[in-house]
Each structure stands twice: as C-alpha cells, then as structure tokens.
C-alpha cells in the first residue's frame, strides 16, 4: 500500500453555471462533459487497494451539477475510508437532491465529510446563508473565522444538528489561467483559444497547483495537476490555436493508472513535484495577473 502525503482532488465535471474569468480549470468557457460514478467505481476500487489517501476534495466545474454527486461522496468515502470535502460555488444547494443523506449516512469513525463553498462575491453572503440554512437541519450554529471552534479556518462555518458542516471561504480573485481566449478581428462571435509559451521551470515555480500540491484524479487517472489533465480535453472540444508540435506535447503526458501502477508508480511519484514539459503552457510570474471575479450566470446577462 502506497501512502500519499497529501490530499487528492477528484474532478467529476467540466460543467459550471458561472463564468468566472481566469478559472484555472477552464470551466468558465463552454466546457462540457461529466463523469458518472458507476462508470469509474471499479477503477477506484482498484486504486483503493494500492494507495492510501489522507483526504479528498471532490470538485469540478460545479460538482453539484453532476447528477451522481451523492454516489461519488458515498463511493469515495467508503472505498478510501477518508474525509471527503465537496468544493462548490454555493449556488445549487436547493437542487442538491440526495446529497445531505449521502453526507450523513457514510460517516464512520473519524470520517466527517463536509462542504466547502468558494464565495466569489461577499455581497452574496446573505443569499448564500439562506440557501445553506435551507439545506441543513435546524438548529444551525454559525461560527465566524475567529471563533475557537471553527477548526477549518473558514470565513464562516455552519454546523447543524447532525454535525453536518458547510464552510464558506471568500475567494473573489483569480490568477491568470493557462487558456487565453481572444476574438479574431472581423469574426466577433468566433472565439479562439491560445496557451502560453513559458519556460517550464519558471512556470512551475509560481504555479498554485505545484505550490499547494493539487494532484488530480480525472477519469480515474492520476495527474500532476488539473491543467495537464484538462487541456487535451478542452482542445478536443474547441481546437486550441497551437502548433502540431505543441499539440503532440500537450497529449504526451502519461498519467498514473491502475493498469500501469506497478511499472510506473515509483517514477511517477519521484517526479511528481518537478516541472514537466507541459508547464510551458502555463503563465510565469511575469505574465500572471490577479483579477477580481465578477461572475455571470451562464446564459444570463446579470452579475451573480
């Protein structure tokens, strides 16, 4: 059994209902596709036989838009005997059928699955608060960031009568993403997408995925980060404006799988925290900017 020192991110959908500029997994664009738990359950069962994980975050996209989210929570919790955090933008609590029961029913021992909300606009907190209170079971305790019992260091911690927890974190700025959209002159409705052309060493040095060791399970395959997993899939849907040589490089990354684990896992983990050739497609410190998020709901014109 191989012990991973850090949590893993389990990515289950490209789909998001918001258009947050500079989303680092490109979900602000028309990025489609989601993963059904039953399609990957057997592979994750095999993973549970070879690795041990300290914690898991289920994310997207917007994971609440994956109709099998309760199955993911139940399945990952039971297979890996681990705490599961669900990372959401907080706009879909009233459409989360079956999720509360999944959070409640899979608990055993020290496992306490919970929800984390990345709140992109602090002026939306009161609306979010109403939705969270609707989702949880009264009475609900609300702790601020300075409360001694807020062990998650969140801006607000909601804990209900069944000890189900929703943490809210204000996240209203994003850094420059790998994919750069632009509109061709004379073709205002046709978007084209570019990647960066950086020194891989310097891109990796300032990469949030690398700094916070955000390793990703996508389609039951383990990747160094989200972009290296998702850029080829985005390219399939939108055809990035890159050279054939760069496209070959983009698709050359070898993830760790249950099938190649025995032959490849030592090399994979030994190099996991080192730059890879595909880092060239991400920004460096010189090209990174920080932008305040003003998310729109997709298909609507008003700010969230």
Descriptions of predicted regions:
Residues 38-45, 49, 78, 101-105, ...:
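Polar/charged alpha-helical tracts
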Residues 30-31, 65-67, 94-95, 123-127, ...:
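Short catalytic/ligand-binding loop motif for oxyanion handling, primarily in non-cytosolic enzymes
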Residues 66-213:
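Conserved AdoMet/S-adenosylmethionine-binding subsite of the radical SAM
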Residues 62, 128, 132, 250, ...:
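Generic structural signal of hydrophobic/aromatic residues within well-ordered alpha-helices
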Residues 1-101:
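Conserved alpha-helical substructure of the radical SAM core
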Residues 33-34, 44-45, 79-81, 95, ...:
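Short, surface-exposed linear patches
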Residues 183-304:
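Accessory C-terminal segments flanking Radical SAM cores
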């Amino acid at each position: 059994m191989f012990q991973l020192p850090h949590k893993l991110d389990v990515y289950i959908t490209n789909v998001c209902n918001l258009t947050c500029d500079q989303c680092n997994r490109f979900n602000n664009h028309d990025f489609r596709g989601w993963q059904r738990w039953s399609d990957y359950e057997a592979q994750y069962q095999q993973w549970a036989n070879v690795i041990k994980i300290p914690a898991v975050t289920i994310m997207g996209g917007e994971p609440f838009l994956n109709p099998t989210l309760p199955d993911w929570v139940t399945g990952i919790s039971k297979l890996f005997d681990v705490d599961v955090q669900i990372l959401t933008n907080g706009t879909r609590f009233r459409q989360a059928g079956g999720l509360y029961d999944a959070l409640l029913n899979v608990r055993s021992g020290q496992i306490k699955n919970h929800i984390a909300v990345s709140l992109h606009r602090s002026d939306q907190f009161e609306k979010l608060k109403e939705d969270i209170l609707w989702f949880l079971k009264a009475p609900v305790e609300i702790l601020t960031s300075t409360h001694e019992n807020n062990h998650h260091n969140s801006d607000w911690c909601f804990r209900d009568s069944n000890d189900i927890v929703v943490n809210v974190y204000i996240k209203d700025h994003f850094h420059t993403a790998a994919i750069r959209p632009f509109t061709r002159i004379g073709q205002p409705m046709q978007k084209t997408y570019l990647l960066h052309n950086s020194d891989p060493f310097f891109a990796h040095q300032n990469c949030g995925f690398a700094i916070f060791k955000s390793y990703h399970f996508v389609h039951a395959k383990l990747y160094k980060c989200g972009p290296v997993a998702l850029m080829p899939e985005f390219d399939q849907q939108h055809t990035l404006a890159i050279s054939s040589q760069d496209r070959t490089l983009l698709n050359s990354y070898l993830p760790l799988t249950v099938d190649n684990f025995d032959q490849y896992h030592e090399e994979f983990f030994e190099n996991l925290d080192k730059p890879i050739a595909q880092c060239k497609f991400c920004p460096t410190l010189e090209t990174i900017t920080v932008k305040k998020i003003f998310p729109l709901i997709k298909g609507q014109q008003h700010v969230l």
